[in-house]
């Protein structure tokens, strides 16, 4: 479960960038597990300012104070308190990349955003400034400061587009410079209608880095394919990532198996060391059984009526008329099939968006790490709760006999509570 300030920033930013190219697999496999007790209290003091204070206990008491200001208007329609928030908005879950998801999404325009956070008792500071010059270009400045002379400043110049994304990065840490890009290969809409195939597209992204102080380069590229099932309308995503310098190859398959579940499998392989790993992850959503949304009825498919002899009504030849009637019947069935596929996709995503979920279970495991990660996110009486653990496998020797026993013990265990007004 993401924090409140990240939820506010996420509502203002686009996820059409290289960083979110493999978001679906990361959300199902590498989700964050709390390792201590943490309580976070947030509120919206003015229409443009947000405040957060949190306290955590991990052997010692730690905490932080966060402040955010933005000149965005109309955030009341997007930012909800913990009692009215949609749990799908604050949980890192399967990311729908296809175009039909933007059913009820609203765009909020803003020119600047200021974010600051101070940790205590160590007094670490972190901040961020986002300044938009145009609708598609912005500059992001992030910095981290502490008393042990650890001061890092990183600047980003980002340019967004419907199909393209470009980003230049400069950091004071080893004078690191980087360039990241993303291009979406979207098929042109059909002249007849928007069909299933217009919701399938390929995304290609890459990143190039160079540490000027040590002259250490690195690069990576990622390919993503998104589509829907023709019969059920459920989305699925395939990614392939490759780092040529380290020889790391990673492939993922993520699918929304139903409106209440998602599954992901990832296979990693190194070309140089021949090491491999297989990771599995899934999430199970629970719907509120007391509150049923009446408006979740499936929309009726729109049938396109093609009149007989549509292409030629002036032919006097009986044989030619029979051929034209066969052509009309063929095109009519194709149009109905196109509309049926589109209706199935739109109905699935509309039904998913309108469902009232109360909690979600997440599970992930890895053959190489031999662990089991469990996370539960949910709502209870206006509070947002997140509890999880990571079980790892260890071998212990039995004193009575020399046989080794396999045991599992929790390497991480924690509980996080959030409340916002």
UniProtKB/Swiss-Prot annotation:
List the subcellular locations.
Answer: Mitochondrion outer membrane
Has keyword Cell membrane?
no
Biological classification of the source: Eukaryota, Fungi, Dikarya, Ascomycota, Saccharomycotina
For the keyword Nucleotide-binding, the answer is no
Question: This chain belongs to which protein, by name?
Answer: Mitochondrial distribution and morphology protein 10
Membrane topology listed for this record:
Multi-pass membrane protein
UniProt GO BP: establishment of mitochondrion localization; mitochondrial genome maintenance; mitochondrial outer membrane translocase complex assembly; mitochondrion-endoplasmic reticulum membrane tethering; peroxisome organization; phospholipid transport; protein insertion into mitochondrial outer membrane
- UniProt feature coiled coil, ranges: none
Keyword entries, A-Z: Membrane, Mitochondrion, Mitochondrion outer membrane, Transmembrane, Transmembrane beta strand
Species of provenance? Vanderwaltozyma polyspora (strain ATCC 22028 / DSM 70294 / BCRC 21397 / CBS 2163 / NBRC 10782 / NRRL Y-8283 / UCD 57-17) (Kluyveromyces polysporus)
* Principal localisation: mitochondrion
State the family it belongs to: Belongs to the MDM10 family.
């Amino acid at each position: 479960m993401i924090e409140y300030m990240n939820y506010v920033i996420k509502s203002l930013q686009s996820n059409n960038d290289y960083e979110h190219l493999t978001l679906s697999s990361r959300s199902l496999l590498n989700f964050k597990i709390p390792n201590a007790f943490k309580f976070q209290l947030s509120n919206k003091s003015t229409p443009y300012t947000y405040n957060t204070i949190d306290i955590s206990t991990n052997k010692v008491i730690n905490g932080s104070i966060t402040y955010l200001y933005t000149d965005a208007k109309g955030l009341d329609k997007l930012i909800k308190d913990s009692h009215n928030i949609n749990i799908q908005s604050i949980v890192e879950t399967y990311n729908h990349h296809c175009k039909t998801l933007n059913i009820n999404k609203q765009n909020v325009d803003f020119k600047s955003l200021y974010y600051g956070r101070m940790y205590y008792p160590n007094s670490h500071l972190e901040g961020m400034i986002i300044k938009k010059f145009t609708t598609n270009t912005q500059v992001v400045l992030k910095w981290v400061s502490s008393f042990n002379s650890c001061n890092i400043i990183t600047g980003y110049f980002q340019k967004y587009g419907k199909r393209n994304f470009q980003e230049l990065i400069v950091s004071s840490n080893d004078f690191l410079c980087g360039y990241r890009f993303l291009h979406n290969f979207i098929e042109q809409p059909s002249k007849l209608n928007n069909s299933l195939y217009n919701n399938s597209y390929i995304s290609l992204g890459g990143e190039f880095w160079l540490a000027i102080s040590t002259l250490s380069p690195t690069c990576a590229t990622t390919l993503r394919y998104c589509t829907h099932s023709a019969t059920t309308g459920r989305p699925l995503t395939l990614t392939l990532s490759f780092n040529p310098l380290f020889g790391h190859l990673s492939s993922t398959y993520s699918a929304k198996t139903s409106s209440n579940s998602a599954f992901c499998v990832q296979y990693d392989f190194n070309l140089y060391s021949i090491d491999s790993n297989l990771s599995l992850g899934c999430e199970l959503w629970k719907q509120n059984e007391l509150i049923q949304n009446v408006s979740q009825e499936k929309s009726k498919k729109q049938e396109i009526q093609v009149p007989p002899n549509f292409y030629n009504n002036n032919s006097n030849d009986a044989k030619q008329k029979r051929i034209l009637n066969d052509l009309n019947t063929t095109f009519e069935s194709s149009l109905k099939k196109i509309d049926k596929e589109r209706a199935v996709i739109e109905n699935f995503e509309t039904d998913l968006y309108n469902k009232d979920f109360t909690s979600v279970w997440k599970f992930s495991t890895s053959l190489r790490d031999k662990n089991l990660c469990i996370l539960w996110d949910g709502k209870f009486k206006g509070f947002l709760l997140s509890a999880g653990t990571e079980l790892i496998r260890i071998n212990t020797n039995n004193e009575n006999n020399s046989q080794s026993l396999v045991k599992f013990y929790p390497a991480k265990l924690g509980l996080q509570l959030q409340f916002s007004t």
